[in-house]
């Protein structure tokens, strides 16, 4: 999954600024840029702090700190003193913030060697944790970011992970060594390959394989009651203030997902809680009847990352919400508007 690392380094990390610039991963979604600066200022004088936000326009939130876009869960902090930067890594790396454990490491200027270093791994044993996966791939190089996809209801692994290496060459070595390899505790070989680029046309075929394969890797639709979801009043309040939703599916505006067969009482909060665990969600919209203000049975969700959107579709298509079985797919021109 792309965390935008190489896309933002030109802005944040021009030329060689020494060992003062840090990248901070796994930040809580609701953490603000001011809070990021405040946290790292406790170690030493911070020259700049930047929380990376989604570039998708077309919506506004009530909080001014979120008005420029939804946080992508990572940022950069640049210290005036290299010793403070090193001390921040030693002190704050592994710090638990809300439900996240942040990762703090040195950032590097953008170059071709660090682009396209993101791996997609499937077929992992369900018992493997994020740490297990990182330990497995760590011998190949420095890991910038990693994520194991889990079932949002049970918290159990889905056997799928993404790992972003520091360099493409490290990712290539991992593919050469582990693609088709059987890890301990597994009777089946795992698949290790470069994560799909949202700009590539072949993603359409990839999505078809993920979502329409007769033998779905996740064992078919998962049936849970709507009450299993936990709601965040703050999250619902933010999402209710969205004035418009861009439903175009593209690499620049995000990937729009069509959700059909929602109940009359469905609201934006349900969509937010359902799709949020799969990745960065920028927009949600429940289509309502003008007279009754009840849901008309469908809505839209926009996610920034293709792999995360595809995984959400593969997992939630056929999901039973209350007494309804959802139909979830990428929005096409023939979808409801």
UniProtKB/Swiss-Prot annotation:
Subunit text: Interacts (via RRM3) with cirbp. Unable to form oligomers. Part of a ribonucleoprotein (RNP) complex, at least composed of elavl1/elrA and/or elavl2/elrB, igf2bp3/vg1RBP, ddx6/Xp54, ybx2/frgy2, lsm14b/rap55b and, in a subset of RNP complexes, stau1/staufen.
Family as reported in the entry's similarity comment: Belongs to the RRM elav family.
UniProt entry keywords in alphabetical sequence: Cytoplasm, Developmental protein, Gastrulation, Repeat, RNA-binding
Gene Ontology cellular component annotations, sorted alphabetically: cell cortex; cytoplasm; nucleus; ribonucleoprotein complex
Domain RRM residue range list: 20-109, 117-197, 255-333
GO biological process terms held by the UniProt record: 3'-UTR-mediated mRNA stabilization; gastrulation; intracellular mRNA localization; mRNA stabilization; regulation of mRNA 3'-end processing; regulation of stem cell population maintenance
InterPro entries assigned to the protein according to its UniProt record, in alphabetical order: ELAD_HU_SF, Hud_Sxl_RNA, HuR_RRM2, Nucleotide-bd_a/b_plait_sf, RBD_domain_sf, RRM_dom
Role played: RNA-binding protein that binds to the 3'-UTR region of mRNAs and increases their stability. Involved in embryonic stem cells (ESCs) differentiation: preferentially binds mRNAs that are not methylated by N6-methyladenosine (m6A), stabilizing them, promoting ESCs differentiation. Binds to poly-U elements and AU-rich elements (AREs) in the 3'-UTR of target mRNAs. May be involved in cytoplasmic mRNA polyadenylation. Acts cooperatively with cribp to stabilize AU-rich sequence (ARE)-containing mRNAs. May play a role during gastrulation. Required for the vegetal localization of vg1 mRNA.
Stated name of the protein: ELAV-like protein 1-A
Organism: Xenopus laevis
Subcellular location(s) per record: Cytoplasm; Cytoplasm, Cell cortex
Database matches in SMART domains: RRM
Domain of life: Eukaryota
């Amino acid at each position: 999954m792309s965390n935008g690392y190489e896309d933002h380094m030109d802005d944040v990390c021009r030329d060689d600024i020494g060992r003062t610039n840090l990248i901070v991963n796994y930040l809580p979604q609701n953490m603000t840029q001011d809070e990021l600066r405040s946290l790292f200022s406790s170690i030493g004088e911070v020259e700049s702090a930047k929380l990376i936000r989604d570039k998708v326009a077309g919506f506004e939130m009530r909080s001014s700190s979120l008005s420029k876009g939804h946080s992508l869960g990572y940022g950069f902090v640049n210290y005036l003193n290299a010793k403070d930067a090193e001390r921040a890594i030693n002190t704050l790396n592994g710090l638990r913030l809300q439900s996240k454990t942040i990762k703090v490491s040195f950032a590097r200027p953008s170059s071709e060697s660090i682009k396209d270093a993101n791996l997609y791994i499937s077929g992992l044993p369900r018992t493997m944790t994020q740490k297990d996966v990182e330990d497995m791939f760590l011998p190949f190089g420095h890991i910038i970011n990693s994520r194991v996809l889990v079932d949002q209801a049970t918290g159990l692994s889905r056997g799928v992970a993404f790992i972003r290496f520091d360099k493409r060459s490290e990712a290539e070595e991992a593919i050469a060594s582990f693609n088709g390899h059987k890890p301990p505790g597994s009777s089946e070989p795992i698949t290790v390959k470069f994560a799909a680029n949202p700009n590539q046309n072949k993603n359409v075929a990839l999505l078809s394989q993920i979502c329409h394969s007769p033998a779905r890797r996740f064992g078919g639709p998962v049936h849970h009651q709507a009450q299993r979801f936990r709601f965040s009043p703050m999250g619902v309040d933010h999402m209710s203030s969205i004035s418009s939703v861009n439903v175009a599916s593209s690499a620049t505006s995000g990937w729009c997902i069509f959700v059909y067969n929602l109940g009359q009482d469905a609201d934006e909060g349900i969509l937010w809680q359902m799709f949020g665990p799969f990745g960065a969600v920028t927009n949600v919209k429940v289509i309502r009847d003008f007279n009754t203000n009840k849901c008309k049975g469908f809505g839209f969700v926009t996610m920034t990352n293709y792999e995360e959107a595809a995984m959400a579709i593969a997992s939630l298509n056929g999901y039973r919400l209350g007494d309804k079985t959802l139909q979830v797919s990428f929005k096409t021109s023939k979808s409801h508007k």
